[in-house]
């Protein structure tokens, strides 16, 4: 997907760069939420810097993105460039878009999402760390998902603390959530939504079920949905004899995810690395009890046994204990789910949009003021 016109208006004019909107994942969800919130005072044009397909198709899309960016900066009345970035190839692609934007004298807001950026950055050769840090410091403002990520970027990349804003991801808050009771069709439905692979602990989750007593496993139904290594996970489920307990789905639509969220009692995400996962926020908004891990921005949101249960990444015995606790304790499930929903009410779309537009306005103002000061010298 190339250039996408969202709103035409007379207020702030923003170029947003990020993954194509037809891709899957949390970054795309964040972009769509922002674009849906754009109002009469903000015009947002979206440029896709990454699309699905072969390496040739991806390269062609990125070159087109650079052309669209340059053309808009040259011909359009652009006030600010908002760049979504993660790790690995994304970090280098968006380094080019940052440099082009600054070459045209435009303020840049870099919006970071990479759950493994710290590992990626720390394993780069020293020269590339220096170059990447230099480019990132060219950005006028940084948006991170949690205080822990702010500390990392300030310390590792030597960003100015006052230029780094913490803005947790937004989430749509359902008006009402169902009364969940004691499970669905005699079983307690647990769900996992996200990329299926080791980083999000999908294989650990399946293996942990072997540690459950048979009576608890008989009451459990686990549905896992996502892209990635779904076939490998199906093989593991069959190998462990858990076909009657675990259902593996490929990536499902938002409507299917909503339907499952209404039926489910518990959301599980035993990740090794995260930013602040959209799937977690969405599950909490539906009032699901949550089992997850204290990684990335999660411990800033989840307090153990207050609005969720935290287990250590990779500890399948601890994970099984948490699962067993919530299978057997309906009251605790209800209390944790209610507290989880209350915790994400401040993350609603209206509050998020106000915070984001405040960042836009202050960044544009600071950039304009700095240019005037430099001109008057």
Regions found by a protein language model. Give the residues of each.
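Nucleotide-activated donor-binding/catalytic signature segment of Leloir-type glycosyltransferases, i.e.
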Residues: 234-252
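Conserved acidic donor-binding segment of nucleotide-sugar-dependent glycosyltransferases
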Residues: 304-305, 309-316, 325-330, 345
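Glycosyltransferase donor-sugar binding loop
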Residues: 48-52, 193, 220-234, 250-251
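Donor nucleotide-sugar binding/catalytic pocket of nucleotide-sugar-dependent glycosyltransferases
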Residues: 131-176
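Aromatic "clamp/platform" in nucleotide-sugar-dependent glycosyltransferases that forms part
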Residues: 272
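Conserved donor-binding/catalytic core segment of Leloir-type glycosyltransferases
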Residues: 15-17, 182-209, 223
